[in-house]
Amino acid sequence: GGNLQVTLTDTVGFIQDLPTELVSSFKSTLEESKHVDLLVHVIDASNPYHEEHEKTVLSIMKDLDMEDIPCLTLYNKADLVEDFTPTQTPYALISAKSEDSRENLQALFLEKLKDIFEVFTLRVPFSKSYKIHDLESVAILEERDYQDDGEVITGYISEKNKWRLEEFYD
């Protein structure tokens, strides 16, 4: 993980039975997320209408042409529901009040991003090693192998940030 920078955006809560202006606010906030690498959809599993909520959000995502964005569904409060069955994949059952659950989220996000991002191997001469810090903010650097003439870095990077690797090539 290192210094990978992420941006989290929160939308208004559930949108069914909301005043029209809040529904449009939800849609516009969600629409701003069209270019994200990973959309995290948090569901209150203890809400008896959670399946309808999921369907509504998925329908809006389809309307906004966002159904191809990789999505991770987090079911919060699933521990409060007997025999809870998730309806979306990939998913994780979480409890926002549990410290273990919060710590596991970072690892879960990194694993999901590794699934989405492309693997790269990069030879960086010592003369360009000062640029590695900038790379750490947009890529997951998995391995750094120091050699006589520089280092070899293996990691993961998004399609839209692949151009950042070009500055290391001669």
Where are these predicted regions, by residue range?
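Short loop/turn elements that form and flank the Walker-type P-loop nucleotide-binding site
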Residues: 1-5, 34-36, 66-69, 87
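Switch II (G3) loop of P-loop NTPases
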Residues: 2-26
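Hydrophobic "anchor" residues on beta-strands that sit immediately upstream
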Residues: 6, 33, 40, 72-75
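Walker B catalytic acidic pair
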Residues: 11, 45, 77
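Conserved ATPase-coupling elements of RecA-like P-loop NTPase cores
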Residues: 17-20, 49-54, 82-86
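Inter-motif core of Ras-like GTPase G domains
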Residues: 22-47, 63
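Alpha-helical scaffolding segments of alpha/beta enzyme cores, especially the outer helices
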Residues: 31, 56-59
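C-terminal-of-GTPase-core extension/linker across diverse P-loop GTPases
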Residues: 48, 59-170
